[in-house]
């Protein structure tokens, strides 16, 4: 299994709409670890670690997000893989 790390900045209406909660739920379904946190600028930062195939599924999901959000864009960068035990909302 090819594990990778990925940092995503999600823009749009993504705060105060349950975005981090639904991201945690979706990540756990895909066995992806990491965190989601609100940024002061109104975006959400999502850091993910896991199998490349599962990260790809999460990236596809993040492009749309939950029904309560309106994603206008994502910026993706690969980061070094780190072993973590869960996905949390900060």
Swiss-Prot record:
Reactions performed catalytically: an acyl phosphate + H2O = a carboxylate + phosphate + H(+)
EC supergroup of this enzyme: hydrolase
Keyword vocabulary terms for this entry: Hydrolase
Active site: 20, 38
GO molecular function (one): acylphosphatase activity
Pfam families, per the entry: Acylphosphatase
Protein EC: 3.6.1.7
InterPro entries: Acylphosphatase (IPR020456), Acylphosphatase-like_dom (IPR001792), Acylphosphatase-like_dom_sf (IPR036046)
PROSITE patterns: ACYLPHOSPHATASE_3
Domain Acylphosphatase-like: 5-90
PANTHER family: ACYLPHOSPHATASE
Family from the record: Belongs to the acylphosphatase family.
Name used for this protein in its record: Acylphosphatase
Gene designation: acyP
